[in-house]
UniProtKB/Swiss-Prot annotation:
Gene Ontology molecular functions: structural constituent of ribosome
Superkingdom, natural source: Archaea
Similarity section: Belongs to the eukaryotic ribosomal protein eS17 family.
Pfam families found in the cross-reference section: Ribosomal_S17e
Keywords for this protein: Ribonucleoprotein, Ribosomal protein
Entry annotated with the keyword Ribonucleoprotein: yes
Gene designation per UniProt: rps17e
Keyword Cytoplasm: no
Protein name: Small ribosomal subunit protein eS17
Length: 74
């Protein structure tokens, strides 16, 4: 089964990705630092959840682009 994330994490992560798409990468540690710089998070756990979800979204986006490129090539 998948991970369950609260709406605050998903909403915040999507908003940050929409506003600053080039600042985030597939690296969790990098994303954690960027999240800390961009927003004031009350707890370390919440910051890590947001950074983890952003990392997940970037990986999914990268996989989707690879599949699209592969389909175009064929």
């Amino acid at each position: 089964m998948g991970k369950v994330r609260i709406n605050v994490v998903k909403r915040t992560a999507r908003k940050l990705l929409q506003m600053y798409p080039d600042l985030f990468t597939r690296d969790f540690e990098h994303n954690k630092k960027v999240v800390s710089q961009l927003i004031e998070v009350n707890s370390k756990k919440l910051r890590n959840q947001i950074a983890g979800y952003i990392t997940h979204l970037k990986k999914v986006e990268e996989r989707r682009q690879k599949v699209e490129l592969r389909e175009e090539y064929l």
